UniProtKB/Swiss-Prot annotation:
Keywords: Methyltransferase, S-adenosyl-L-methionine, Transferase, tRNA processing. This is tRNA (guanine-N(7)-)-methyltransferase. Catalyzes the formation of N(7)-methylguanine at position 46 (m7G46) in tRNA. The active site is at residue 142. The gene is trmB. Belongs to the class I-like SAM-binding methyltransferase superfamily. TrmB family. Transmembrane segments: none annotated.
Length: 237
């Protein structure tokens, strides 16, 4: 996942930044490179340490959905195509994924999607206006399954409060993971977080909503009997 988080000692002194992603840039295919060259001027957003004018960016006022870490972008493009009444922004640190997403969006005729290739924490802090998001999506983040790496997980108390600032009142933070231990970690962090309310009728997970497409990876997991956990928490104050 494309994020960094500050680490402080017990006295509150800054120590270092912890990265929650491993940079696996890989090589761009010719198609991805072509998509970046041709479509970035239309759908790409360059990082700048100032708030975006979201109405100007999309040329209209509409609910904004932000996804962190969209991978190759197939699901994000499908969601944007299926919800033309909403504006979508995707953040992904790996340029091959950004190129793939742009190409897929063009093929699908999607015009309500913009992408940013930068660290998500910095984008949230500097570019996303407070109270501007209808939904923030975090699907299948790196689980960092070894105990000594749990501190690298993106869903941490400070980060979910950063997200809360960016959500409108009534806006939702939607998470999904295929690691049960990480799902339990998410539930623990979110249940303790100020200003959020779990939308689950059972106080834990929600069924996969229709708007979140099944990924190929997820379909394979279902066939093998693997679980997937969705959590949706609403900002209430």
């Amino acid at each position: 996942m494309p994020v960094t988080q500050d680490v402080f000692n017990e006295d509150g002194k800054f120590m270092r930044k912890i990265r929650s992603f491993v940079r696996r840039e890989g090589r761009l295919t010719k198609g991805q490179e072509k998509a970046l060259e041709e479509l970035w001027p239309v759908m790409g957003i360059d990082f700048a340490p100032e708030p975006l004018d979201l109405v100007a960016l999309f040329g209209r006022e509409a609910p904004v959905v932000l996804e962190i870490g969209f991978g190759m972008g197939a699901s994000l493009v499908e969601m944007a195509k299926n919800a033309p009444e909403k504006n979508f922004i995707g953040i992904e640190v790996h340029s091959p994924g950004v190129g793939a997403c742009l190409g897929t969006a063009q093929e699908a005729g999607v015009t309500n999607l913009r992408v940013i290739c930068h660290d998500a924490v910095e984008v949230l802090e500097h570019m996303i206006p407070n109270g501007s998001l209808a939904c923030l999506q975090l699907f299948f983040p790196d689980p960092w399954h070894k105990s000594r790496h749990h501190k690298r997980r993106i869903v941490q108390p400070a980060f979910v409060q950063d997200i809360r600032q960016k959500l409108a009142i009534g806006g939702v933070f939607h998470m999904a993971t295929d690691w049960e231990n990480y799902a339990e970690h998410m539930l623990e962090v979110m249940s303790a977080a100020e200003g959020y309310e779990n939308t689950s009728a059972t106080g834990n997970w929600v069924p996969r909503p229709d708007w979140r497409p099944l990924t190929k990876f997820e379909q394979r997991g279902h066939r093998l009997g693997h679980g997937v956990w969705d959590l949706i928490f609403k900002r209430v104050n």
